[in-house]
């Protein structure tokens, strides 16, 4: 009860819970969060919590398959458990060959972390150079820990730490997708002068 003897609603508790959950994934409870909450109607899906790499892989495939013109990937090393998988590679290939002006952009932390020899995603990028571009992140962005995949400006899979499976997925959530697409674009532009060819390791 409040001072007037009236029952208190759960609005404050709900807001606190929402803030804590978003904060745990590195999302700020601010104007962007307000936009997300305001758009939680049938036209915009809520965020799905991911707890395993199997879920991350499946969500990444769903996000990539929804792309119409642009896929943007932030990753330390094109994580093989996610991106060097036959299903995802086929989705990417169909995306770039099936859509006019389609583009896939990848920002990697460094090439040295590629392990186990050739990465099939990079091999595909060498075959489809008009559609896939890979850049090494500029030095000031090398320590970013997040990993995500964004389709157009609407769908996203996001993890605060690339070495952990915990994350979120929004398959139709423009506010969150645009928030991180803006970050990606800034890193992409800053990394232009650092751009270098990423070579496939050969035995």
In which residue ranges do the predicted regions lie?
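Acidic/glycine-enriched edge-of-secondary-structure segments
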Residues: 37-54, 69-82
């Amino acid at each position: 009860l409040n001072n007037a003897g009236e029952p208190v609603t759960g609005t404050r508790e709900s807001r606190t819970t929402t803030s804590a959950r978003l904060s745990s994934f590195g999302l700020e409870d601010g104007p962007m969060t307000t936009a997300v909450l305001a758009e939680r109607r049938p036209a915009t899906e809520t965020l799905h919590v991911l707890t395993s790499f199997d879920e991350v892989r499946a969500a990444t495939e769903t996000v990539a398959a929804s792309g119409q013109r642009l896929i943007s990937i932030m990753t330390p090393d094109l994580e093989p458990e996610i991106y060097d998988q036959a299903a995802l590679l086929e989705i990417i290939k169909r995306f770039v060959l099936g859509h006019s002006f389609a583009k896939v952009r990848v920002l990697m932390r460094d090439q040295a972390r590629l392990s186990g020899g050739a990465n099939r995603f990079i091999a595909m990028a060498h075959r489809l150079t008009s559609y896939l571009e890979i850049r090494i992140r500029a030095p000031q962005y090398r320590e970013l820990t997040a990993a995500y995949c964004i389709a157009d400006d609407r769908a996203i899979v996001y993890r605060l730490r690339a070495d952990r499976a915990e994350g979120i997925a929004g398959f139709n959530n423009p506010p969150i997708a645009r928030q991180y697409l803006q970050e990606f674009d800034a890193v992409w532009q800053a990394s232009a002068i650092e751009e270098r060819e990423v070579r496939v390791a050969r035995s």
